[in-house]
UniProtKB/Swiss-Prot annotation:
GO terms for molecular function: exodeoxyribonuclease VII activity; nucleic acid binding. It comes from Parafrankia sp. (strain EAN1pec). Its EC number is 3.1.11.6. Its main location: cytoplasm. GO terms for cellular component: cytoplasm; exodeoxyribonuclease VII complex. This is Exodeoxyribonuclease 7 large subunit.
Amino acid sequence: MPLTSTPDEPLPVRTISRALGDWISRLGRVWVEGQVTEISRRPGMNTVFLTLRDPVADVSLRVTCPRAVCDAVGPGLVDGARVVVWGKPSFHPGRGTLALAVVEIRPLGAGALLARLERLKATLAAEGLFAASRKRRLPFLPTAVGLITGRASAAERDVIENARRRWPAVRIELREVAVQGPLAVSQILDALSDLDADRAVEVIVIARGGGSLEDLLPFSDEALLRAVVAARTPVVSAIGHEQDTPLLDFVADVRASTPTDAAKRVVPDVSEQSALVEALRSRARRVLAHRLDLERRRLADLRARPVLAAPLREIDRREQTVGALRSRSLRCLTHAVDVAERDLVHAAARMRALSPAATLERGYALIQNADGAVIRSPAEIEAGDPLTVRVAGGTFAARAE
């Protein structure tokens, strides 16, 4: 109901403030469009504070929202971004200020594009398409370089001129395509497929100059990004300037900051390589000369040794030593044989002297009984026992009496 007041019965400030608060609270949630001018994310707090300014009038509104709501928007929620928010307005009587508690934020224009690209980036990153482990090494000196760029563009000129300046014999397979607009993605995909099928092409450069976020959108297209990942040939992204970062930069095997930088990355500099070869030659010469000098000194040291001053002298000395040892060994051997021969003669004489046959030769006889036992005493036989008598000339029978 309307408030009534008179000069004599004015309404207190608190009454007006409470009435405004009650009326505003009945509005419910509303959609509000504005421009973000200030964001405050305080560490440890789940509430984010920001200011929303009217894009036409000089009017601003204090906004609060949960941190998760702001995080869901992504990097597009920055100062200057235009957004549409859904929230419930409230009036604080104590401060006399109007605020908006927001539960949803939707970016407009570039902010919406950035949010969509951020979601795609997160999806591809989760699939591992940005991982360094899947990046392929560029060939040192490619047989041919594939170049996908705009017709008669500055990017085309920069890549070709710098590549041929660095390596005059480089072969460029050029595919001119639309680099912005609705036809760009399909033409780039066709050119990529064509160059990837050419076995002579060992690296592909996708290049264009700088541009607005909308101009560079084809190079963040999901179909193109997945085609680059699936390509057999390494791909170099050379889109825009240093500050431009389309999603192609993340899936490409190498990201070049500019088209000129791409040319430097895909082919070596002939003058640098010539200087490197010459430096390696000089180093090889120095190493070889040092080794030869070292071996010469070693050979001179060997030749300076006394033994090499008269090499036959040592051989003669060794020959004399061998001759003396030979003579000594012959003398020792002859002496040993003589001693052994004398010992053998003495042993044979002793054997003959101690032999029973020698005793028999001296006229003795050996008497044995019938069992063959030697008779050493007459008591060992009886009269009539048969005996065998062995003399030097043989044996004969006898009988005891």
